[in-house]
Amino acid sequence: MKNLTGIFSALLVAFNEDGSINEQGLRQIIRHNIDKMKVDGLYVGGSTGENFMLSTAEKKEIFRIAKDEAKDQIALIAQVGSVNLQEAVELGKYATELGYDCLSAVTPFYYKFSFAEIKHYYDTIIAETGNNMIVYSIPFLTGVNIGVEQFGELYKNPKILGVKFTAGDFYLLERLKKAYPNHLIWAGFDEMMLPAVALGVDGAIGSTFNVNTPRARQIFELTKQGKLAEALAVQHVTNDLIEGILANGLYLTIKELLKLQGVEAGYCREPMTAKATDKQLEVAKALYAKFL
């Protein structure tokens, strides 16, 4: 297994206007991340990949393309989580057979699952695949909150390496790192990277890293070195960019920023707005000129 720490892009997926996967565009996004952004790895099949609007076959195809293009150049994490446990297991087996370095799974959502059911979900995926696992915690979208003691219960399974922590609860983050120092934490909010790194995270997984990895790496390294004023200056610029992206449409705008760099990033998947308006294109061009 490769080193899983550092800067990981949450991989965007290029779609054609009819919603089908644009394989050429997806390969270009992967190459851009590896060759230009110099990421340490890719997190494939997450929220940024518009994953929860895709069929099982489409998810498998994205895993296949990403592994075929990246090969062993960087670390690859496959997000296989689903409210359908059978699908999660099927995807986990497939990604493991392809040679992904680790699996990740979002907490099961929509229904109010008990913690015992959530633990069973993770233990089952691990038992069926034999691969390592990263818990994907994103409570503002799933409504699932896992406490410090509950993480301890999950961590009794030695295959669970840590958590992708996409939350703003830095008290919980600090408590987790203190309680379980041997388990890894990846920051999931790009706009709050500096405080997360100051609290000891081992890496970061972010959507804006598809276009902004150099600054993300600066924040990560400067904060680790204790150069907080310098790191904060970079975080300010990063957040100015992120603010513009969020106001203009997150995934759509990042795709337009990639297109401005010659990457065939395609469209978004409906029911998201698939194609940028003229106004959104103007904003993307202004963001590109100012920040990239």
Swiss-Prot record:
Reactions it catalyzes: aceneuramate = aldehydo-N-acetyl-D-mannosamine + pyruvate
Enzyme Commission code: 4.1.3.3
UniProt keywords, alphabetically: Carbohydrate metabolism, Cytoplasm, Lyase, Schiff base
Protein location: Cytoplasm
UniProt-annotated binding residues for aceneuramate: 47-48, 166, 188, 190-191, 207
Gene Ontology CC, one term: cytosol
GO biological process: carbohydrate metabolic process; N-acetylneuraminate catabolic process
Pfam families: DHDPS
Cited function: Catalyzes the reversible aldol cleavage of N-acetylneuraminic acid (sialic acid; Neu5Ac) to form pyruvate and N-acetylmannosamine (ManNAc) via a Schiff base intermediate.
The protein's name in its UniProt record: N-acetylneuraminate lyase
